[in-house]
Design a protein with these regions (language model features):
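Beta-strand-enriched, solvent-exposed domains that form extended recognition/catalytic surfaces
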Residues: 24, 59, 88-92
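Conserved beta-strand in the GNAT
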Residues: 43-45, 51-68
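Conserved acetyl-CoA-binding loop-helix of GNAT-fold acetyltransferases
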Residues: 75-88, 167-172
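Nucleotidyltransferase catalytic core that binds NTPs
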Residues: 101-360
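Short amphipathic alpha-helix that is part of the acyltransferase structural core
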Residues: 1-35
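A short, internal acetyl-CoA/4′-phosphopantetheine-binding micro-motif in the GNAT/acyltransferase core
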Residues: 67-76
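Conserved GNAT acetyl-CoA-binding A-motif
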Residues: 89-103
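Short, well-ordered alpha-helix to beta-strand connector turns
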Residues: 40-42, 94, 178, 262
C-alpha cells in the first residue's frame, strides 16, 4: 500500500516478504538496530522523491518501535509523518500509544504531542499518547482511595498466577502491620490465569481482611507497556532488568505514592527469578528517597525439599498442573484457588498450561 504527500512517499512493509524485511534490516543496521519481523505487528517505510529510503517505523501492540529517520532529514517533517501514521493506526483500536527512547529525544516526541511519564537514565525514557493517559489512572486511584486518618498506609503488588498460600501469607503479614493496605493486581494478560480469574481468586481469598483495598494495575504497574526489553537488545540482560525495574519503580514513586500517601511497600524475598530480584533491588534503592519504607518478607515454606526449604511458589503449582498432579501442591493453595483448580471451571486454563512451557 502506498501513500503520497508533497515531500515523501510512504509504504506499508510486507512482513512476509524476505526482500522487504531485508530492506528494513539493512537500513536499521546502520543505526545499531537488529530488526526482527516477528518483533513487530506493522512496519512502514518512508522514501524521498528520488526513491531513497530515508525512514521507518513499526509497532508491536501499542508500543512504537524502530522509529528512525536518516540524519539529514531529521529537521524535516519525516519523523512526524512516521509517528503520526503509526499513532493514527493504533488509535483506531487502542486507547494508549507508548514509545521508548533515549532521554535526549524526549523533547522531539513532546513536540508532536507525546507526554513524558518516566525515565531510567541514561538509557531510556517512556512517553505516551492517546485518548487515555496516566492522569486517568491517577483519577482511578483517587476514586478507589479509602478515607483514613492514619499515615500507616502500605502497598503491595502481586500477579498471583495463581493465588497461593504464599501470597496470602505476605498479604496477611502486610495487612496486620498496616492500618490500610493497597493491593495492586497486575492487569497484563500475559499470565496463564486471566486477570479476571486472578482477581476473583484473590478477592475470595482475602475477604476476611477488611483493611485491604484491591487495585487494578492498569497500564502502569508491572505492565508490558512499560518493559522495553526490545530497546536494549545489545545490552547485558542484567542491565535490561535493572532499567525496566527502575522505570516501574519510578512510576510508582512519582504517581502512586503521592496519590495514595503510601508509606510502606511490602515485597517477598526472591531467590529464583533474576528479573524479580532486580525489581526488589530497585525498590530498596529508589523508594526510600520518596519516604517509602521497603519491607522485605521471607517467603513462606512448607517443610523441606531435600536440604532446602520447600518455598511456596506459583510456578510449582503450574508445574503440578502440567504433570496432572495438583494434589501434590494442595497445601500450597488457599481454599479459593484449590476449589477453582479442582472444578471444571478451570479446565481450559489447565489445558493451556499443559500445552505451554512458559514460566508464566
Amino acid at each position: 500500500m502506498i501513500f503520497e504527500n508533497t515531500d515523501f512517499r510512504q509504504e506499508v512493509l510486507d512482513l512476509h516478504s524476505p526482500y522487504d524485511v531485508k530492506l528494513v534490516q539493512s537500513f536499521l543496521k546502520k543505526y545499531n538496530f537488529d530488526f526482527l519481523s516477528e518483533d513487530v505487528d506493522y512496519t512502514m517505510i518512508l522514501y524521498n522523491l528520488n526513491g531513497n529510503l530515508i525512514g521507518t517505523g513499526s509497532h508491536k501492540g501499542k508500543i512504537l518501535k524502530y522509529v528512525v529517520v536518516e540524519q539529514q532529514y531529521r529537521e524535516s517533517s519525516a519523523f512526524a509523518q512516521i509517528v503520526t501514521h503509526l499513532t493514527d493506526i493504533l488509535l483506531q483500536h487502542e486507547k494508549y500509544v507508548f514509545v521508548f527512547t533515549l532521554p535526549a529525544n524526549i523533547v522531539i516526541f513532546e513536540g508532536i504531542g507525546f507526554k513524558h511519564i518516566a525515565s531510567a537514565p541514561p538509557l531510556f525514557s517512556v512517553l505516551e499518547f492517546g485518548y487515555k493517559s496516566i492522569t486517568d489512572y491517577v483519577d482511578y486511584l483517587l476514586r478507589i482511595q479509602r478515607d483514613t486518618h492514619t499515615d500507616n498506609i502500605a502497598a503491595m503488588v502481586v500477579n498471583c498466577n495463581p493465588f497461593t498460600n504464599g501470597h496470602l501469607f505476605l498479604i496477611e503479614k502486610a495487612a496486620s502491620e498496616s492500618e490500610l493496605l493497597y493491593l495492586f493486581v497486575v492487569e497484563e494478560e500475559h499470565s496463564a490465569f486471566p486477570f479476571d480469574i486472578r482477581w476473583k481468586l484473590i478477592e475470595n481469598g482475602i475477604a476476611h481482611l477488611k483493611n485491604v483495598v484491591m487495585v487494578k494495575g492498569g497500564e502502569y504497574i508491572v505492565s508490558g507497556s512499560i518493559f522495553p526489553s526490545y530497546f536494549l537488545k545489545n545490552e547485558e540482560i542484567s542491565l535490561v532488568s535493572q532499567k525496566q525495574a527502575e522505570l516501574d519503580v519510578n512510576i510508582f514513586a512519582n504517581y502512586v505514592v503521592p496519590t495514595l500517601q503510601i508509606k510502606k511497600r511490602y515485597i517477598g524475598t526472591e531467590n529464583l527469578c533474576k528479573t524479580t530480584a532486580a525489581y526488589n533491588k530497585a525498590m530498596h534503592e529508589i523508594l526510600p528517597k520518596h519516604n517509602v519504607e521497603v519491607i522485605e518478607i521471607k517467603r513462606k515454606a512448607i517443610g523441606m525439599c531435600g536440604d532446602v526449604p520447600n518455598f511456596i511458589s506459583a510456578s510449582k503449582v503450574r508445574q503440578a498442573i502440567r504433570e496432572n498432579n495438583i494434589m501434590s501442591v494442595i497445601e500450597f493453595l488457599p481454599e479459593s484457588t484449590a476449589n477453582f483448580l479442582l472444578s471444571n471451571d478451570s479446565w481450559e486454563i489447565r489445558q493451556k498450561i499443559k500445552k505451554s512451557d512458559s514460566r508464566h
